[in-house]
Structures are given as structure tokens and as C-alpha cells.
């Protein structure tokens, strides 16, 4: 009866994937998986070597708040609206050895991690994963790299990048407070970074980046340099030493649930050949 109830609610595919992989990774949405992978690769974290295209992830973000018939069918198919605990417990009734990890957004609410039991849920201390790499300097460098540096409009384009970015920082981060914005701009690099992190800890920086790319496209013409869902491409432009230690801690958690990949000689990768 438990098997029938679980399969009816979550769908057989959820059970099959959990049985094959031995774990479930709970994230807000598909872009989180892309960002975690990009961060792992940028940091050279060991978990990057275990990554494959069959990540068993479950998206907990409820994209369908209105419970019409279509939304309800979508919820049952994809699991939207079900908490990680409900989903994991339903599957673990069938798979007692199942491991679970949730890496979820804080959303500015000081959510507390849960580390006891087979399902561990950790929250980003900042608003979301994007808050660990999106900065004005990064957006400026990325945008500049996407336009010709040696044509007649190069200086005009750079001016547009700076002005769009400054206007956005002033309004979205400093709430229009010109004096505070000026202090941030004139601060040393270290002080500027600390102030940026403090001011944006509870702000959704993915939205900030999307607004920047939209504003820039309107200003200089042409298409968006990056669309929603492509922000993980920015990670390649981040100096590894600038990525907070917390990111590595989250990746360490991920390494604990990912299965060890076997080399062609049958030796676990990263463990060496037994003596």
C-alpha cells in the first residue's frame, strides 16, 4: 500500500531515479544545479569530477501557486508544492538506504539548516547562490568582454555599461541614497566588497543581474548578453579566491551524497590504488 501511495503521488520516475542513484538532491530549480556545477569546476572541487548528466535532483520551488487542474497535474508530475521532507520520506519508505541533501535559498529569512538524519538541508547564508558571485565588477567585466574593444563605439559602449550599472546599484542596492552610494564607490576594494556583501545579503542578486542585462540591451541595442537561466556562465569570470568559503562547504556536503565514480581499473577516483 505504501509503495502504491508513493508512486501515485510522486510518479514512478522519481522512485526509479532514486533507486538507481541512491540519493536525491533538493534545489530550488534547474539553474541551481548549473550554478553548483560551475562553482565546483571553478574551484577545482573534487565533486566536479563526480558530476555526470544524470543528477537526481528535485526542484522544490513551487511555480504553480494557483491550483487549477493544469497546475495540479503539473504538480503531481513534477513534485511542485511538496516539501523535501515529504518527498524524501515517501521515497525512503521504499528505499531505506536513500540519502538526501537540500541546498536551498535563504530568501533573507535566516532559515536554519537541518543536519541530523538521512536528509540534510542546508541554506545559503546569503539570499541565494547568485549572491556569492554577482558583483558590479563581475558584471562590468563580463559585459565589456562581449563587445569589440577596438571599434569606433568601444568607449561609448563602456560608458553605457558603467552608467547602466551605476544607476542600478544606486536604486536597487542603496535605495536611491546618493551619499551611501558615493561612499561605496570611493571605498578601497576590500571595504567596497564588505559593504556590497552587507547591503545585498538579503537582496535577490539574480534579479539585479537580469535587470542589468535588460537595461544594457535597451541602451546599446542588440539582444540580451545573458538570459534568465544563463547566469551560471558568469562563474567562469570570477577569481576562485574571491569565492566565499561557504561555497566550498556546500560542495563538501554534495560530495558526501554523490556516488563514488569508478575508474576503468575499478579503483575509486581520488582514493588511489590500494597498497
Regions of interest found by a model, annotated:
Residues 97-203:
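Activity-critical C-terminal alpha-helical subdomain
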Residues 1-101, 106-110:
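RecA-like P-loop NTPase motor core
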Residues 170, 174, 222-226, 240, ...:
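Intrinsically disordered or highly flexible coil/loop and linker segments, enriched in small
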Residues 191-245:
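C-terminal structured domain segments
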Residues 1-17, 244-275:
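Switch/communication elements of ASCE P-loop NTPase nucleotide-binding domains
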Residues 40-44, 87-92, 216, 235-238, ...:
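Hydrophobic, Leu/Ile/Phe/Ala-enriched alpha-helical segments that form helix-helix packing faces
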Residues 2-6, 14, 35, 86, ...:
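Exposed alpha-helical structural elements
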Amino acid at each position: 500500500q505504501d509503495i502504491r501511495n508513493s508512486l501515485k503521488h510522486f510518479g514512478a520516475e522519481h522512485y526509479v531515479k532514486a533507486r538507481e542513484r541512491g540519493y536525491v538532491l533538493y534545489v530550488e530549480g534547474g539553474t541551481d544545479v548549473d550554478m553548483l556545477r560551475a562553482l565546483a569546476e571553478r574551484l577545482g572541487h573534487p565533486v566536479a569530477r563526480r558530476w555526470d548528466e544524470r543528477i537526481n535532483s528535485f526542484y522544490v520551488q513551487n511555480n504553480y501557486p494557483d491550483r487549477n487542474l493544469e497546475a495540479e497535474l503539473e504538480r503531481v508530475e513534477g513534485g511542485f508544492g511538496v516539501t523535501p521532507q515529504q518527498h524524501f520520506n515517501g521515497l525512503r519508505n521504499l528505499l531505506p538506504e536513500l540519502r538526501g541533501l537540500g541546498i536551498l535559498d535563504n530568501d533573507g529569512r535566516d532559515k536554519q539548516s537541518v543536519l541530523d538524519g538521512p536528509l540534510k538541508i542546508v541554506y545559503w547564508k546569503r539570499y541565494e547562490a547568485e549572491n556569492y558571485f554577482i558583483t558590479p565588477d563581475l558584471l562590468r567585466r563580463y559585459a565589456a568582454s562581449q563587445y569589440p574593444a577596438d571599434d569606433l563605439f568601444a568607449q561609448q559602449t563602456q560608458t553605457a555599461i558603467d552608467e547602466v550599472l551605476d544607476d542600478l546599484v544606486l536604486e536597487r542596492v542603496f535605495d536611491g541614497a546618493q551619499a551611501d552610494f558615493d561612499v561605496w564607490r570611493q571605498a578601497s576594494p576590500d571595504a567596497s566588497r564588505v559593504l556590497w556583501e552587507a547591503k545585498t545579503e538579503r537582496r535577490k542578486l539574480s534579479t539585479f543581474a537580469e535587470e542589468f542585462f535588460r537595461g544594457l540591451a535597451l541602451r546599446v541595442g542588440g539582444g540580451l548578453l545573458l538570459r534568465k537561466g544563463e547566469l551560471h556562465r558568469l562563474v567562469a569570470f570570477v577569481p576562485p579566491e574571491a569565492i566565499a568559503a561557504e561555497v566550498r562547504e556546500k560542495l563538501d556536503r554534495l560530495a558526501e551524497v554523490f556516488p563514488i565514480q569508478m575508474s576503468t581499473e575499478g579503483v575509486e577516483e581520488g582514493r588511489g590504488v590500494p597498497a
